[in-house]
Amino acid sequence: KFCYNYGELEDIPPIGEGMWEIGGTKFYEKDIDLLLSIQQKPTGIAYVYLEPFMEIEKYYSIIKKFSDAQVYQHLYTNGTLATEETLKALGEVGLDEIRFNLGASNCSDKVIENIGIAKKYIKNVGIETPMTPEFFKSFFEKKQAILGTKLDFINCAELHLNENNI
């Protein structure tokens, strides 16, 4: 309920099959090498559109390209579709950071387990989720398990409000 575009997704035009939006401009993956060779490379990239694990295999090659160019990259997920295999693959292609929206799953045991698995393969692993009353309650009920994952950070300071969720 507290995603950036809650209730507005049908109004957002699709990026386009095989395309990536970077800095407001759409690129085909095949053009990324050219982009990196002629423009100043970005200092960082955040993968924030929808749930990446629905088609995570499409992310591997693009993450690898930016990793090879030494661009810091982080990915947001609710974590429900992550597996050890996909988390390991993300680490192998060079993802620097993964941020789990633990509130989206109401502190699901499976997602907490995936946070621990991610720590084995990805450099920086954390929680970034809005601090809602429901999340606060669930978090404190499962606090020991969450902290036991050895995650690197917890960011619970934000709310993404729009006319559809207030």
Report each predicted region and the residues it spans:
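Residue-level marker for beta-strand->alpha-helix junctions and adjacent short loops that shape enzyme
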Residues: E10, P52, T80, S105, ...
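Conserved mixed alpha/beta catalytic, RNA-binding, or beta-rich assembly cores of soluble enzyme
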Residues: L9, K41-I45, E163-I166
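Canonical Radical SAM [4Fe-4S] cluster-binding loop centered on the CxxxCxxC motif
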Residues: K1-F27
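Conserved C-terminal portion of the radical SAM core fold
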Residues: I112-I166
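Conserved SAM/AdoMet-binding glycine-rich loop
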Residues: L36-C107, N124-G126
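N-terminal pre-triad scaffold of radical SAM enzymes
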Residues: K1-E8, G44-Y47, I127
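Alpha-helical scaffold elements within enzyme catalytic domains, especially in hydrolases
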Residues: F2, K65, A89, I117, ...
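Short, acidic/polar
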Residues: Y28-L35, A82-L90, F136-Q144
